[in-house]
Design a protein with these regions (language model features):
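Non-catalytic scaffold segments within catalytic domains of secreted glycoside hydrolases
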Residues: 1-137
């Protein structure tokens, strides 16, 4: 911070009592772990077979629902915005047909994750926005 910025004690009390307008959530894929004392930190990655693996890792929209529900519970029902969600699937998914790129795995990924967000909303989680990972998603 700038040295000239010295909030007063009253300002700090107001800041600490405040609540953010929203919490931004970036989600691409889960990292699943299991207990393994022989590994550093006592954990090892756990395989998660999925129907269509991405460069990002396992595709698992249900883990997005779990994450949103956990944030909702632990942070007293904040407003959430999915600020990034997407995946890359590579040349196996990107077929050029005329002047169109057909990428059914990316489309399915996005559709499944939007459905996951809607499931969380139907369960009462205040998700107010959803942004794709990039222009190409």
């Amino acid at each position: 911070y700038a040295p000239a910025f010295q909030p007063s004690q009253d300002d700090m009390k107001k800041i600490m009592q405040g609540r953010p307008d929203f919490i931004g959530v970036n989600f691409y894929s889960p990292t699943l772990v299991k207990d393994d004392p022989s590994q550093p930190f006592g954990i090892a990655n756990r395989p998660n077979p999925d129907q269509y693996p991405s460069y990002n890792g396992p595709v698992s929209p249900s883990h997005l629902v779990e994450l949103l529900m956990q944030i909702d519970k632990e942070y007293d029902h904040p407003t959430l915005i999915i600020t990034e969600n997407g995946a890359g699937f590579g040349v196996d998914d990107e077929k050029l047909t005329g002047n169109r790129v057909l990428d059914p795995l990316r489309a399915k990924y996005l559709s499944d994750h939007i459905d996951a967000v809607l499931s969380a909303r139907h369960a009462g989680v205040k998700v107010e926005g959803y942004l794709f990972w990039s222009l190409l998603d």
